[in-house]
């Protein structure tokens, strides 16, 4: 799988993300989760990742991308009718959502939808909704290069170095 942002070059024991609930996830944990995802779902699948504002959500988004699959990143509390509309339009092969306190999956479950698999562009890294409030089913498509460029822009703007800690 693609080692986006050189995650494999970080100390696997170093904390990659932590949240206000005290959950800490290491770089090694994210890579292990990506391997778990990669070995358990069809390659280049569309995965709706319904996230809460927590470390588990960050880990799942990263793991789905690192495993070579494409997440549509949505708020876990997206209105039911909007979510159903998005599922009808985009027909994801999997849906990941917060459901369990399982420490191996950081409080999220991944379930197959049984929608047929279809070809996704090889450059597509992830999808984001254009707006959470209008109910529009339109999505913004992002490429792998966009992630690297955004990370570089952010690190340049804030003059971040590898010695800086995000928390």
Briefly describe each language-model feature range.
Residues 91-95:
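Proline-aspartate-enriched helix->loop->beta-strand connector
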Residues 10-41, 83-84, 142-145:
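Conserved AMP-binding/adenylate-forming core of the ANL superfamily
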Residues 26, 125-152:
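Conserved AMP-binding A3 loop
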Residues 47, 64, 130-133, 166:
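Conserved S/T- and glycine-rich ATP-binding loop of Class I adenylate-forming
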Residues 23, 36-77:
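Conserved AMP-binding/adenylate-forming
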